[in-house]
Design a protein with these regions (language model features):
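Residue-level marker of regulatory loop/turn positions in helix-turn-helix DNA-binding domains and
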Residues: 5, 207-209, 217, 240, ...
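Right-handed parallel beta-helix
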Residues: 118-119, 157-165, 221-231, 244-255, ...
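Short, T/G/N/S-enriched strand-turn elements that build extracellular solenoid repeat scaffolds
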Residues: 82-84, 101-109, 236-242, 275, ...
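Extracellular "leader-to-stem" segments immediately downstream of a signal peptide or signal-anchor
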Residues: 2-113, 117-226, 249-251, 255, ...
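Short glycine/acidic-rich loop motifs that flank beta-strands on beta-rich extracellular proteins
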Residues: 90, 103-105, 125-127, 148, ...
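Extracellular beta-rich repeat passengers
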Residues: 326, 337, 343-472
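Alpha-helix capping and helix-loop boundary segments enriched in small/acidic/polar residues
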Residues: 69-72, 260, 264, 268, ...
């Protein structure tokens, strides 16, 4: 059974502000003593974005898929219901209680909602050939034709996956073993992206196999995924790529092996992620926008994103990341009200010197954290550096109201001499125990306001240079 978080969402949300205020009552360093690097964020912007996200419009008609014999492939019946309803103008495809086996992907169409009722489990099988023919996808930031995601929609509008049921990818047994042979294939795809090989010629199947995504919406508008439990992903779990108006609400992601990111908005606009629980072996939410030259070629940022009221219940991953595939840019992001029992990191801005691109106007507040390797990290030296000369630009970031019990690193910032991390405000942060409170190399206009670690006020005078070693 997955580990349950002992503290309720209501208790955490109610207690965070009070405890932080009490601790900071004796901390006297304020912005009267040091000017903010830029204006304070207007958090009403987050609500404006959330309200601007357009929900899908699904017609009222529905099709209840008839039960199939135990152990039989239900995919033909499910896909037939999708196609029939789509031809009629759209509607809801309903899976009732029981186990529904799918020997291959379900492809959604415009106007379709796949609804899993209480007690329904949609379980995907591991026959790789059934996830062919190849579809257009984006794999770790590079466009490619490869194995279909298990649930996939391409150039669809008004599309949804909803309900209290479960979707089981059986990824650890069937697809994670592909990872051991992945290195050369992964590098080849990155070479194709760097060298500008036409996307139509990037076909990665057979011996060039890449693990499929779990649920991917590709070039879609007005998308909703709500209420479902996603379990045991083959790769990234929910991956909106080149999408607009995406709502992810009240889902639970359970997948404790590597690369099982929960939700990865990728070159997408107007995205709302709220009230979700992540019990994953990687990032709960990772905001992305393409890798290196291929990301520059496309040039679509991720922007106007709100992530709020979520719980991270993994132990070996992290709660929220920006990057590392962020070459198209990430901007106008608002993150608030996270509760984290244990993690490698709470908030991670990551890229390397190949990426280029920029991260701008990202604001995070109200994090309650138990134990973490690093509370907040900025680095442009993330692994897989390929020798380029395109340092990313990180700037205009605020971090406020962070309450941490224990951290190996409190705040760690690694910029580059030609591209320092700049214009960062950290205020009202309390860490009870921090082995290394602050590391800082190549940062400008970094401001700390009411930051306490190890029971005392901390300023930039306490910072030590970034040292080699793992922080996440």
């Amino acid at each position: 059974m997955p580990r349950e978080i002992a503290i309720s969402r209501r208790t955490l949300l109610a207690g965070a502000g009070t405890s932080l205020a009490l601790v900071l009552a004796g901390c006297r360093h304020t912005l009267a003593d040091s000017a903010a690097p830029f204006g304070f964020p207007d958090w009403s912007r987050a609500e404006t974005i959330a309200k601007s996200v357009r929900p899908p419009v699904i017609p009222a008609r529905q099709s209840v898929v008839a039960a199939v014999a135990e152990g039989q492939d239900a995919r033909p019946a499910i896909q037939s219901a999708v196609e029939t309803l789509h031809a009629d103008g759209g509607g809801r495809v309903v899976l009732g209680a029981g186990v529904w086996l799918s020997d291959g992907p379900i492809h959604l169409r415009s106007g379709i909602e796949l609804h899993l009722q209480e007690g329904a489990t949609l379980r995907f099988l591991g026959n790789a050939d059934k996830y062919l023919p190849a579809v257009l996808t984006r794999w770790e930031g590079t466009d490619v034709w490869s194995y279909s995601p298990m649930i996939y929609a391409h150039r669809a509008h008004d599309v949804a996956v909803t309900g209290p049921g479960t979707i089981d990818g059986q990824g650890e047994a069937n697809f994670l073993p592909w990872r051991k042979d992945q290195g050369p294939i992964q590098r080849l795809l990155r070479d194709f992206g760097r060298d500008g090989v036409p996307v139509a010629e990037r076909v990665f199947t057979g011996e060039r196999r890449l693990r499929p995504h779990f649920v991917q919406f590709h070039q879609c508008e007005r998308v909703l995924i709500e209420g479902v439990t996603l379990r045991d992903s083959p790769f990234w779990m929910v991956h909106p790529v080149y999408c607009q108006d995406v709502t992810v609400r009240g889902i639970r992601c359970i997948s404790l092996h590597i690369n099982s990111d929960g939700v990865d908005p990728d070159s997408s606009r107007r995205v709302l992620i709220e009230n979700c629980t992540f019990e994953v072996g990687d990032d709960g939410v990772a905001i992305k926008s393409g890798r290196d030259q291929d990301g520059w070629r496309v040039g679509i940022p991720s922007e106007q994103i709100v992530v709020r009221n979520c719980i991270y219940g993994g132990t070996i991953g992290g709660a929220v990341a920006i990057g590392s595939e962020m070459s198209g840019g990430v901007r106008d992001v608002w993150i608030e009200n996270w509760r984290i029992a244990k993690s490698n990191h709470a908030l991670y801005f990551k890229a390397n010197l190949d990426r280029g691109g920029m991260i701008r106007d990202v604001h995070a507040r109200n994090f309650e954290i138990g134990e973490t390797a690093a509370a907040v990290i900025f680095t442009n030296d993330y692994h897989s550096y390929r020798g380029g000369n395109a340092p990313p630009d990180f700037g205009r970031v605020t971090v406020e109201n962070f309450r941490v019990a224990k951290a190996d690193y409190g705040l760690a910032i690694q910029g580059h001499p030609t591209a320092p991390v700049h214009d960062v405000l950290v205020r009202r942060m309390v860490i009870d125990e921090a082995t290394t409170p602050i590391e800082l190399s190549h940062g400008t206009n970094i401001v700390l306001d009411s930051v306490m670690m190890n029971g005392r006020s901390v300023t930039l005078a306490d910072a030590v240079p970034w040292a080699p070693g793992k922080r996440h």
